[in-house]
Amino acid sequence: MTGIRAQLWIVAFGFFMQTLDTTIVNTALPSMAASLGENPLRMQSVIVSYVLTVAVMLPASGWLADRVGVKWVFFSAIILFTLGSLLCAQAETLNELISSRVIQGIGGAMMVPVGRLTVMKIVPREQYMSAMAFVTLPGQIGPLVGPALGGFLVEYASWHWIFLINLPVGVVGALATLWLMPNYTTRTRRFDISGFIMLAIGMATLTLALDGHKGLGLPPLAIAGLILCGILALAGYWWHAKGNSSALFTLRLFNNKSYSLGLIGSMSARIGSGMLPFMTPVFLQIGLGFTPFHAGLMMIPMIIGSMGMKRIIVRVVNRFGYRRVLVSATLLLAVVSLSFPLVALMGWTLLLPIVLFFQGMLNALRFSTMNTLALKDLPNRLASSGNSLLSMVMQLSMSLGVSTAGILLGVFAHNQVVTNTPATHSAFLYSYICMAIIIALPALIFNRVPADTGTNRNLPRASAKAANR
């Protein structure tokens, strides 16, 4: 194995660990709740803590890699992720599990962006597409096997193993990084620590406020304090960034209409879409009485639909345009999402994989189109900052979505659920109705996309062949 090929394998395993962990936990939440003696309706904090940490730490990852070197940052990311996994497996209370997920999230936040940067450093630019296709393939496999693997481990072993399986991969990856990966550094500008702290406080406090009453049991006064603190922190960042060329994210990004619409639309849309991976396995297990493994297998059609749609997205957008694709996909996703509990509660369980397949297709169509809309017209000097802000907003909105789903289910179930009962069915149905409305609302934003927004081109055949080697 050549040196470069070995280094690409290291990055690929990092991608696999991170993407696997984003999906493997969802199926295990009801079993975790039973083991820890917790209400299943409080378990969304296990997901929120991880995703929110990733969102907060993302802006610092690229700067750290440039300053300290990709080798040491990637090594530290793997160590933190592996240590967090070990602590998660040893957790005996929900608070211990949440704290361990924060450690995991710090490692996960650095793993993927630093991995991309590593690939840029170790391969010639003309081979970058082929190299990225190689390292991201395991990352595509992670979400495909994650739900089923998580369900299998929970059903036939225990939920602790969804974290313990990271240990051997992490140890091998860390040793391989020390042995094989070169340490590239780059001269960097001074890091905007003030802006970073204000954004981190704003994101964390507002998300905690949303999750505070149902998930954390905070009193109303504490929640009001968190909201006020979050608003002041974000307002402070806005004031700090005005006319500041060294700000973490320049406000000049919002002078670009496509970027503004894409970013705002992406955040609002991902709040709705972020509810689905959390609610689906919980509904299947608590609402319908499925086993964890069965619920995990049911998630596979959604991933297959998502992967299949990615192959034809460019043709669909070129044929119908950004505005029509985004508005139509958003409204259709709302309808399909609401049809999922309706089909299930009418007893047509054989149709559920088909519904989930279309849900995955529509999600992929909307995600890819939103991302392209946001970045396609940015000038080169703003591309890096714009992409980093978009990545952060994507993670933040997912955490907000999971928190919102947990709140809805807690409100309609009155914080008590019994598996596969009429009262539980009603709670899930009302929650899905609200989710469908939230999913549909971003269509109002996407309807403002100019009708003449430009088209896209497929990759040349030669490049496509290179990417598939």
From Swiss-Prot:
<keyword id="KW-0472">Membrane</keyword>
<feature type="transmembrane region" description="Helical">
    <location>
        <begin position="426"/>
        <end position="446"/>
    </location>
</feature>
<dbReference type="GO" id="GO:0005886">
    <property type="term" value="C:plasma membrane"/>
</dbReference>
<feature type="transmembrane region" description="Helical">
    <location>
        <begin position="45"/>
        <end position="65"/>
    </location>
</feature>
<keyword id="KW-1133">Transmembrane helix</keyword>
<dbReference type="Pfam" id="PF07690">
    <property type="entry name" value="MFS_1"/>
</dbReference>
<dbReference type="InterPro" id="IPR020846">
    <property type="entry name" value="MFS_dom"/>
</dbReference>
<feature type="transmembrane region" description="Helical">
    <location>
        <begin position="392"/>
        <end position="412"/>
    </location>
</feature>
<dbReference type="InterPro" id="IPR023721">
    <property type="entry name" value="Multi-R_MdtD"/>
</dbReference>
<feature type="transmembrane region" description="Helical">
    <location>
        <begin position="8"/>
        <end position="28"/>
    </location>
</feature>
<dbReference type="GO" id="GO:0022857">
    <property type="term" value="F:transmembrane transporter activity"/>
</dbReference>
<feature type="transmembrane region" description="Helical">
    <location>
        <begin position="338"/>
        <end position="358"/>
    </location>
</feature>
<keyword id="KW-0813">Transport</keyword>
<comment type="similarity">
    <text>Belongs to the major facilitator superfamily. TCR/Tet family.</text>
</comment>
<feature type="transmembrane region" description="Helical">
    <location>
        <begin position="68"/>
        <end position="88"/>
    </location>
</feature>
<feature type="transmembrane region" description="Helical">
    <location>
        <begin position="286"/>
        <end position="306"/>
    </location>
</feature>
<feature type="transmembrane region" description="Helical">
    <location>
        <begin position="215"/>
        <end position="235"/>
    </location>
</feature>
<protein>
    <recommendedName>
        <fullName>Putative multidrug resistance protein MdtD</fullName>
    </recommendedName>
</protein>
<dbReference type="InterPro" id="IPR036259">
    <property type="entry name" value="MFS_trans_sf"/>
</dbReference>
<feature type="transmembrane region" description="Helical">
    <location>
        <begin position="161"/>
        <end position="181"/>
    </location>
</feature>
<dbReference type="InterPro" id="IPR011701">
    <property type="entry name" value="MFS"/>
</dbReference>
<feature type="transmembrane region" description="Helical">
    <location>
        <begin position="263"/>
        <end position="283"/>
    </location>
</feature>
<keyword id="KW-0997">Cell inner membrane</keyword>
<feature type="transmembrane region" description="Helical">
    <location>
        <begin position="134"/>
        <end position="154"/>
    </location>
</feature>
<keyword id="KW-1003">Cell membrane</keyword>
<feature type="transmembrane region" description="Helical">
    <location>
        <begin position="102"/>
        <end position="122"/>
    </location>
</feature>
<feature type="transmembrane region" description="Helical">
    <location>
        <begin position="191"/>
        <end position="211"/>
    </location>
</feature>
<keyword id="KW-0812">Transmembrane</keyword>
